């Protein structure tokens, strides 16, 4: 993964983490994601940033999706 892509993925993951107040998201690092998953991560990021609040089940689904997007 290029350094720029890695930085972008890292920022997207960090933004999602902060928006959801996920404390354990630190175990997910940019290098855990393949460059071909960037668009999926970006889509998830856009969805998360648009919403003002999340139900516990939505938060679980987002965490699960992040897990699925890992290499």
From Swiss-Prot:
It comes from the Bacteria. It holds the Pfam family DUF1128. InterPro entries: UPF0435 (IPR009507). Belongs to the UPF0435 family. HAMAP family: UPF0435. This is UPF0435 protein BPUM_0734.
